[in-house]
């Protein structure tokens, strides 16, 4: 699919995008691993369910990526524990408040640097991976600063940071809880469509943590 746009001065630009259409994914109870790669990622912690998740991950010898926040400061010590157990600790947001972090580039990076300082205090290392609250293509940010995501993506990359989105959602971020069984089904169904899956879960949701076990 090719797009052509022009501005008021008559400057024109074209872009070509490949759009892939897949058949609907059939409901599945298990995944035939084959050559699939699945990355488990957990946002918004650490919180009161993170310790239990860490123990489950140890049980199955699985390593994940935690995109951490400071929204539950009483659990900051678990950031160190995540790193100690061999997981990747990455930046999500200190506040996770869209109406603050997306008001300007300065506000975003102030929040990012605050969270990185917390991570470094706990682990001894700077984080090199981030996940934008809402993802890199979120639409909520335009309510506060239209066009900011394009600039932030460029700025983050220029700073040598890697930003990570997801292509499989567990569905656990809804306003109301869903069952552990539904989280499991959402993930199993979602990974069928990808050879490489990045799964989004939240370790502040007990029903989602329970899905791991």
What do these predicted regions represent?
Residues 1-21:
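Serine/threonine-rich, repeat-prone extracellular segments and beta-strand-based repeat modules
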Residues 3-5, 47, 205:
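Alpha-helix initiation/capping motif
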Residues 8, 16, 24, 28, ...:
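Compositionally biased, intrinsically disordered low-complexity segments
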Residues 22-132:
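Active-site beta->alpha N-cap acidic-glycine motif
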């Amino acid at each position: 699919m090719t797009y052509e746009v022009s501005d008021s001065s008559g400057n024109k630009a074209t872009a070509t995008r490949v759009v892939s259409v897949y058949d609907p994914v059939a409901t599945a109870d298990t995944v035939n691993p084959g050559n699939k790669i699945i990355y488990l990622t957990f946002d918004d912690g650490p919180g009161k369910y993170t310790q239990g998740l860490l123990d489950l991950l140890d049980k199955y010898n699985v390593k994940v990526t935690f995109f951490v926040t400071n929204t539950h400061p009483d659990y900051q010590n678990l950031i160190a524990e995540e790193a100690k157990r061999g997981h990747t600790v990455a930046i999500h947001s200190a506040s996770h408040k869209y109406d603050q972090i997306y008001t300007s580039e300065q506000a975003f990076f102030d929040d990012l640097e605050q969270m990185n300082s917390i991570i470094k205090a706990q682990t001894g290392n700077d984080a090199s991976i981030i996940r934008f609250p809402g993802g890199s293509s979120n639409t909520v940010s335009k309510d506060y600063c239209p066009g900011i995501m394009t600039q932030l993506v460029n700025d983050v990359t220029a700073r040598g940071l890697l930003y990570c989105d997801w292509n499989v959602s567990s569905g656990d971020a809804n306003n109301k809880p869903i069952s552990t069984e539904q989280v499991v089904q959402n993930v199993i169904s979602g990974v069928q469509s990808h050879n490489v899956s990045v799964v989004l879960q939240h370790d502040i949701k007990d029903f989602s943590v329970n899905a791991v076990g």
